[in-house]
């Protein structure tokens, strides 16, 4: 449906006209955001060229999203509930073949790092005395994990120092210990200096990790009806911290998001659910 009249002179377009266009435009959210950005830039240019005195597009707002049941279900599928997490980790820890995968998965649940950041951690990045880990890089997949080439993190916000919980310290120390054992007992072990590695010393690949958790899920009596990838453990931390009233800014700082739509969605969803539970409790008093 075409609602923006391109024959209009730019000085005749006001904020109400642009607002009506945004409200009536039948487009996806991403397209609507793009249209708004184009309008902002167009009218900014017109102001700079002195065709108009101010930018009406800046006063118009994107219409609020109306959440559907499908939207809610999609958000809930981005993180694991406590019982789902326990069942999956128990299965990963059950066999030697996936034990290392279980340790890495649990570490990400507590730390919130991306898998590329986790497998780039070296012992020298960890300060056990101060209980912190320095997230300063990710592994470059283009040259292959076996070469262990470390590059910078995804964004400036991703470059961070993260406090370590008791469980994270236990996991890191256990991984370092089993790596030492592998190094002394396996001829194939290639010591590339990373913590989260396979029994042969190569950093755990994202694809291998995802396949392992997918197969572990399939072995469960009641498989989890969610798309399981390494991201779900990071998102699970966001939901757990939100449930425990951690500020959004603090959560974003820990997981390394400068501005994440997914983090916001999960945080908003969980806190809204908590508000609803409070109302149910009050109604039952």
Over which residues does each language-model region extend?
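Basic/aromatic-enriched alpha-helical hairpins
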Residues: 1-28
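Short, basic (Lys/Arg/His-rich) helix/loop patches that form interaction surfaces
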Residues: 6, 90-101, 162, 178-187, ...
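Hydrophobic (often cysteine-bearing) scaffold residues that line and stabilize catalytic clefts
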Residues: 14, 31-39, 100-101, 168, ...
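Basic, Lys/Arg- and aromatic-enriched nucleic-acid-binding interface segment
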Residues: 29-37, 48, 52, 58-121, ...
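C-terminal flanking helix
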Residues: 40-43, 47, 217, 271, ...
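Conserved tyrosine-mediated DNA breakage-rejoining catalytic core shared by Y-recombinases
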Residues: 62, 120-177, 181
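Short, polar N-cap/turn motifs at the start of nucleic acid-interacting alpha helices
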Residues: 125-132, 246-266
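DNA/chromatin major-groove-contacting recognition/catalytic segments
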Residues: 144-151, 244, 265, 269-285
